[in-house]
Amino acid sequence: MGILAVILDSVCERCSGSSLWMLSTVALLSILVVSVVINVLRQLLFKNYKEPPLVFHWFPFIGSTISYGMDPYRFFFNCREKYGDIFTFVLLGKKTTVYLGTKGNDFILNGKLRDVCAEEVYSPLTTPVFGRHVVYDCPNAKLMEQKKGPNGVFDVCKTIAEITIYTASRSLQGKEVRSRFDSTFAELYHDLDMGFAPINFMLPWAPLPHNRKRDAAQKRMTETYMEIIKERRKAGSKKDSEDMVWNLMSCMYKDGTPVPDEEIAHMMIALLMAGQHSSSSTAAWIVLHLAASPEITEELYQEQLRILGHDMPPLTYENLQKLDLHAKVIKETLRIHAPIHSIIRAVKNPMPVEGTPYVIPTSHNVLSSPGVTARSEEHFPDPLEWKPHRWDEAIAVSSEDEEKVDYGYGLVTKGTNSPYLPFGAGRHRCIGEQFAYVQLGAITAALVRLFKFSNLPGVQTLPDTDYSSLFSKPLGNSKIQFEKREPVTKA
């Protein structure tokens, strides 16, 4: 006690002569050091061998959030090498169990509704973007009109975002909606996209700059759709066209309740987001790869000449199905650059992992990353090389006799045993998969028949990937050169 008293007296004496700022700093540092020590001791001394191994981390709450957020795939592969296919890491205070490989995809994406829940995870992200009571909140011609010279430089991400929002709005929502859109709407959708920042899993309401832009964009988009609906209601039942807005305006829920106008507007935001977002990222990667591989661009052009003819008829759905190499370019780009790197579910019941001693508790989330199998040497030789011709040989991506399930939008294969799942699997598999292939095919074919692409002088590599949002896309400067093709003359 004598020694302790001396120490306390010494501390009190020093504190009495220190400023409040200094004392606050010392206190915060002390709390930080103590929390780190306790966190490390808990990991080393109190391991639960019935749960998957926990990725070592220094700071509580933060855990592995930074290393995961900077490059998810590098994080996954590094952890896989150290811990195996099943491991747990702390993501913004929440223990998240990752299960990689085809077995992991099946375990999570085909998890029973009573065991895993997507709504609980994604609602804080999607509700402020789409609006309430929709999605997870409920139980190319125009480019050519923007004339440029015969050659020049353009920003791929910005331009492709405009193209995809024009094509998606016209094909999914009709002529009137498309007529309301200009290039500023691509910027609004970018602001909505930033609402999917990982921090919004925990703090969707935080008054951060990207959240203020998200809310303003959501309000502007809702007002645009509400104006269209209001004008149509005022005009009565007379239809000048058939589109999704008209369709929903006459729809009812099972109990006979008409779909409210605000919910229709929010559904339209979600529909356009689904039709624009991942397609925009994928189409941008396609163009960037074509600029880095001009020989593939020329092969695509020659395929159109050979199959469609030198008169280059307008693109139709039937014509797109004949362009085999175009389809392979899309598949290969989706393989390397899957728009969503992490698919997360909340655990609702303890989940035993077959063949292991692990039981995943309800305090965890579970995470599947189909992009890991698509980038694995065991399934695809030279997995990080962009090689559309790898698809010339049959690659087992699905099985005809695989079990099929109807989740409410028609029979689809469960699909989770495939190493190639760019559109996910299970009950939350992307229902717009076929539309995406048609949209990407039309954009790719239209650009290839009109332009040649090349990298800027001195540029040898593609941009890195931006993982700052839930949806990955090219990072930073994505400018390339274009050159208009000369009209084809018949031989």
Curated annotation (Swiss-Prot):
Heme binds at residue 430. Changing residue 401 to N: Leads to resistance to voriconazole. It catalyses: a 14alpha-methyl steroid + 3 reduced [NADPH--hemoprotein reductase] + 3 O2 = a Delta(14) steroid + formate + 3 oxidized [NADPH--hemoprotein reductase] + 4 H2O + 4 H(+); a 14alpha-methyl steroid + reduced [NADPH--hemoprotein reductase] + O2 = a 14alpha-hydroxymethyl steroid + oxidized [NADPH--hemoprotein reductase] + H2O + H(+); a 14alpha-hydroxymethyl steroid + reduced [NADPH--hemoprotein reductase] + O2 = a 14alpha-formyl steroid + oxidized [NADPH--hemoprotein reductase] + 2 H2O + H(+); a 14alpha-formyl steroid + reduced [NADPH--hemoprotein reductase] + O2 = a Delta(14) steroid + formate + oxidized [NADPH--hemoprotein reductase] + H2O + 2 H(+). It is found in: Endoplasmic reticulum membrane. InterPro entries: CYP450_sterol_14alpha_dmase, Cyt_P450, Cyt_P450_CS, Cyt_P450_E_grp-IV, Cyt_P450_sf. One of its GO terms (molecular function) is methyltransferase activity. Keywords: Endoplasmic reticulum, Heme, Iron, Membrane, Metal-binding, Methyltransferase, Monooxygenase, Oxidoreductase, Transferase, Transmembrane, Transmembrane helix. Induction: Over-expressed in azole-resistant clinical isolates. Its EC number is 1.14.14.154. It is a single-pass membrane protein. It is an enzyme of class 1 (oxidoreductase). GO terms for cellular component: endoplasmic reticulum membrane. The chain crosses the membrane at residues 20-40. Its cofactor is heme. One of its GO terms (biological process) is sterol biosynthetic process. Pathway: Steroid biosynthesis; sterol biosynthesis. Its main location: endoplasmic reticulum. Belongs to the cytochrome P450 family. Sterol 14alpha-demethylase, encoded by cyp51A, cyp51B and cyp51C, that plays a critical role in the third module of ergosterol biosynthesis pathway, being ergosterol the major sterol component in fungal membranes that participates in a variety of functions. The third module or late pathway involves the ergosterol synthesis itself through consecutive reactions that mainly occur in the endoplasmic reticulum (ER) membrane. In filamentous fungi, during the initial step of this module, lanosterol (lanosta-8,24-dien-3beta-ol) can be metabolized to eburicol. This is Sterol 14-alpha demethylase. It comes from Aspergillus flavus (strain ATCC 200026 / FGSC A1120 / IAM 13836 / NRRL 3357 / JCM 12722 / SRRC 167).
